[in-house]
Amino acid sequence: MNTNQRIITIGTICLIVGIISLLLQIGNIISLWISHSIQTREKNHPEVCNQSVITYENNTWVNQTYVNISNANIVAGQGVTSIILAGNSPLCPISGWAIYSKDNSIRIGSKGDIFVMREPFISCSHLECRTFFLTQGALLNDKHSNGTVKDRSPYRTLMSCPIGEAPSPYNSRFESVAWSASACHDGMGWLTIGISGPDNGAVAVLKYNGIITDTIKSWRNKILRTQESECVCINGSCFTIMTDGPSNGQASYKIFKMEKGRIIKSIELDAPNYHYEECSCYPDTGKVVCVCRDNWHASNRPWVSFDQNLNYQIGYICSGVFGDNPRSNDGKGNCGPVLSNGANGVKGFSFRYGNGVWIGRTKSISSRSGFEMIWDPNGWTETDSSFSMKQDIIASTDWSGYSGSFVQHPELTGMDCIRPCFWVELIRGQPKESTIWTSGSSISFCGVNSGTANWSWPDGADLPFTIDK
């Protein structure tokens, strides 16, 4: 074979090998395309599984969570039945108070991402209890915590988290922009009330299930403010009290009735020489009872009770066991304001039982420190200072602060009565301690008709923090 023949032979072999390789590549592409088409058709026609479809009526929501596990769509259905919280039951008979929650937020905040906050309160639906609180738009041990002793700023927001958990950006839910607030559940949805804006023109924004439903404009242009604790819902209607006017003189007080977040009725109290601020309200046998703060001139606490048509009665707790702070030493009470050492005050609460009353108060008569519960069997109507029981909550050497009431409805507890509960704010930082910030943690207790403990459950944080040094 000569040279030209060898060249032609080699070229022919290379051409044949190239053609075979090209055909193999084309076949590989066709195979991949067919395989992809088969997979696509399988995804577009998933295997049908046996599913039960349950239809709920009467204002019921069904929450469905889709969880992707190994490319399999699994539907986890959770039915949540809504009801109307009746609020028609009486308060449960109790003999003392059992510790219910403690969030330790200041202790945890020395190292964790915890909100700077104050004015915490608790409210329960028929399914859960949540802690609500007013943040300062800052975290503990961070530079933005500086100057958070200020009550009203555009950075304050109402948020909530599960009860007993330290409030952080990771477990908290935004509710409203607010420096004064209230919230409650009617069995069908959460109502939140958040007040924000300038002192001479603040506005309360009402939300129902997170949607704005109504607003209330300041009517006296002197720091519109509300409860800093839960509102009250009875038979689908919810009730709150707001104050507008001086903190050290006669102001204006209004009761609002709301349904699904919309105001349907309001009245202004005819209450000369009374001062109502930061009311702690609860339902009792279809009516609302509120025990409030007199920041003007009383050592004892004013109250207002009203029915669902807003027919109301007013008074002061008569007992000589005084509940405000600062206050006079216990002595002769009055069913009107006890004027001795009555200027200024602190948010607080009491529970009425017929002629008797459970009074929650600081142990100190001059500073927000210590806390105790006192049972005065005739203190709602009589003026003596005798009482039959005292339960220690916070030692007099530890800081306390605001306190307020909340309840657990029979729809939550399964009991045939409304369980009374209360929370105590444990304020730390400015103005009493050497920090750049002011914040608080909280504890809560619920009434029981069984054994309880006398002890102290303080905040317990070791101050100052790194940011303060």
Swiss-Prot record:
InterPro entries: Glyco_hydro_34 (IPR001860), Sialidase_Influenza_A/B (IPR033654), Sialidase_sf (IPR036278)
Glycan attachment positions: N50, N58, N63, N68, N146, N235, N454
Compartments in which it is found: Virion membrane; Host apical cell membrane
GO cellular component term, pick one: virion membrane
Residue intervals annotated with topology Virion surface: 28-469
Transmembrane segments: 7-27
Residues engaged in binding Ca(2+): D294, D324, N344
Post-translational modification: N-glycosylated.
Alphabetical GO biological process terms: carbohydrate metabolic process; viral budding from plasma membrane
GO MF annotations in UniProt: exo-alpha-sialidase activity; metal ion binding
Location of the region described as Head of neuraminidase in the Swiss-Prot/TrEMBL record: 91-469
Topological domains, Intravirion: 1-6
Main location: virion
Extra remark: The influenza A genome consist of 8 RNA segments. Genetic variation of hemagglutinin and/or neuraminidase genes results in the emergence of new influenza strains. The mechanism of variation can be the result of point mutations or the result of genetic reassortment between segments of two different strains.
Domain comment in the entry: Intact N-terminus is essential for virion morphogenesis. Possesses two apical sorting signals, one in the ectodomain, which is likely to be a glycan, and the other in the transmembrane domain. The transmembrane domain also plays a role in lipid raft association.
Stated family: Belongs to the glycosyl hydrolase 34 family.
UniProt protein name: Neuraminidase
Gene: NA
